[in-house]
């Protein structure tokens, strides 16, 4: 069923491997994004963005010998340059720098067996820990992780920090930066569409779809773009901002620019009109905003 629903070939995945994968509507729009892990023979876990994906799967499960259930998991993120050292301590040495990007498995963390992947929502070196619903002693896990991280200066942070880092890193938010009215190509995610695989939902529409992107980055030295801000070309509105934040890394205001039509937008200086009516010069750039070779998240900058 996952080969039918997701845009990448799932049946050939190795155990412990993770893929970023999209689910599309029949018309080729982006319905859901997430990471699918192969837990074992015929066992998979799709870590989805917000939305009714389980209902979608159940509706499409007719004719498949499949069991679909929500594990009621909550995800903890250990992200940053010291994350390998922290997880090494938390796992009693079982997790180290040899664990590749987008690999996963079960590990003992303070006496609890939990699923861990070398992924994250920050485009930073890091790990995600998947709690097992009511079976996990969350308080004990929290105390164990904080004790492992204390010698490395680990701190608890909010989703605001996560949002800033994910936008800096070019990670899109489903229904915020992309939605069912956009194809993966328009969202700049064409690399995750395998048109060579057998039929999947949306494939026929995507074969004939325009391959040009409508989504880019925007930088502004004078202001921070916010959701709903307009992008003007010679006083004509040509796009809008889906999400924006101040970037500590770049020292600029940054945001995702969604254009109404394809065009040669990159490297163009345009006008950003904020909701308060003020207008500021801005530049359109390719995503991500930095580390375009993804060396940090792969640990290749160490």
Over which residues does each language-model region extend?
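Conserved, structured C-terminal
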Residues: 36-302
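Extended, compositionally biased flexible segments
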Residues: 1-43, 47-63
């Amino acid at each position: 069923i996952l080969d039918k629903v997701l845009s990448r070939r799932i049946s050939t995945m190795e155990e412990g491997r993770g893929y970023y994968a999209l689910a599309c509507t029949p018309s080729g729009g982006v319905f859901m994004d997430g990471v699918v892990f192969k837990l074992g023979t015929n066992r998979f876990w799709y870590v989805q963005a917000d939305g009714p994906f389980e209902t979608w799967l159940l509706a499409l499960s007719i004719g498949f010998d499949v069991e679909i259930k929500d594990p009621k998991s909550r995800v903890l993120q250990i992200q940053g340059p010291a994350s390998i050292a922290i997880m090494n301590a938390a796992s009693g040495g079982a997790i180290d720098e040899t664990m590749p990007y987008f690999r996963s498995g079960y590990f003992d963390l303070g006496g609890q067996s939990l699923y861990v992947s070398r992924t994250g929502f920050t485009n930073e070196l890091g790990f995600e820990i998947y709690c097992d619903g009511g079976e996990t002693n969350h308080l004990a896990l929290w105390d164990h992780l904080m004790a492992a991280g204390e010698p490395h200066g680990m701190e608890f942070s909010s989703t605001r920090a996560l949002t800033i880092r994910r936008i800096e890193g070019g990670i899109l938010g489903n229904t915020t930066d992309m939605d069912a009215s956009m194809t993966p190509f328009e969202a700049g995610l064409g690399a995750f569409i395998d048109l060579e695989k057998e039929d999947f939902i949306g494939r026929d529409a995507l074969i004939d779809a325009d391959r040009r992107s409508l989504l880019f980055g925007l930088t502004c030295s004078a202001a921070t773009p916010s959701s709903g801000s307009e992008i003007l070309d010679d006083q004509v509105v040509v796009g809008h901002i889906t999400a924006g934040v101040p970037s500590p890394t770049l020292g600029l205001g940054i945001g995702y620019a969604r254009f109404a039509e394809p065009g040669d937008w990159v490297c163009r200086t345009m006008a950003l009109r904020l909701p308060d009516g003020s207008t500021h010069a801005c530049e359109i750039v390719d995503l991500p905003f930095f580390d375009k070779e993804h060396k940090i998240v792969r640990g290749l900058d160490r």
